[in-house]
Amino acid sequence: IESTVDHGIKSMEEDPKRSMRRLCDLGRQFSKSRCQDYLFGIIQELLENEDSSYYDLVANALKNTDHGTIRDFGVAFGYTSWTYGARMLRSFEKRTGHAAPLTLMLRFQPDLAGGLSISDIDNIIQQGTAIGIFSYFIREVGGSSDSYEIINLFRKYPDCGFAYFRSSGRLTAAQIQ
C-alpha cells in the first residue's frame, strides 16, 4: 500500500489536478459501501471546478509537507481507518448490537478540571483501536502548555490518523519532527 501511495504522491507533484481526479475516481470505483461511494461522489463534484481551492490546498501540502508524513497519514485514514477499521467496526456492531463511529472527535483540555488529559485520551485510543476506530480529530481547548505530550501520544499509535487542532499558535519544527 505504501509504495502505491508513494507513487501517487509523486504523480500528484507532476500534475496535481489530474492525479487528484484520478485518485478520486479509483476511490469511488473500489468503494465498498454506500457511504464511501457517496463521499467520493461529493469529492468528484468539488473537483469538477478547475478553480477549486482544493487543488491549491493539495499543491501547497505537497510542497510544504514531508511526503512520508503525507503517505503515513493517507494510509492511516484511507486504509487502516476506512477499510480495515470499518470491517472491525461492522464485526463489533454485529457482535454487540452497538453502533460505533468511524472517527472520534475529542477535546483535549488538560488545564481544565474534569477535562480530558493525555491519560484519558490514551485510554480512549486504546479502547477505540480494539474495536476498529483508527482516526481521531483532537481539538486543544484552553492552550495546553506542552504540546509535546500529545504529539508523543500520537507517535504511540502509528496505525492511527490524527488531526490535531491547536487553540493558538503553531507547532514548532521540533514538535513536527
Where does each model-flagged region fall?
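Long terminal accessory regions outside catalytic cores
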Residues: 1-50
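Glutamate identity and glutamate-enriched acidic tracts
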Residues: 2, 13-14, 45-48, 93, ...
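Generic serine detector
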Residues: 3, 11, 19, 31-33, ...
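Acidic-enriched, low-complexity/disordered segments with a strong bias for Aspartate over Glutamate
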Residues: 6, 15, 25, 37, ...
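N-terminal [4Fe-4S]-dependent radical SAM core
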Residues: 29-107, 130, 134
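Well-ordered, non-membrane alpha-helical segments in soluble/globular domains
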Residues: 75-82, 86, 117-124, 146-151, ...
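A generic secondary-structure signal
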Residues: 94, 123-131, 152-153
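Core AdoMet radical
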Residues: 103-119, 128-145, 157-177
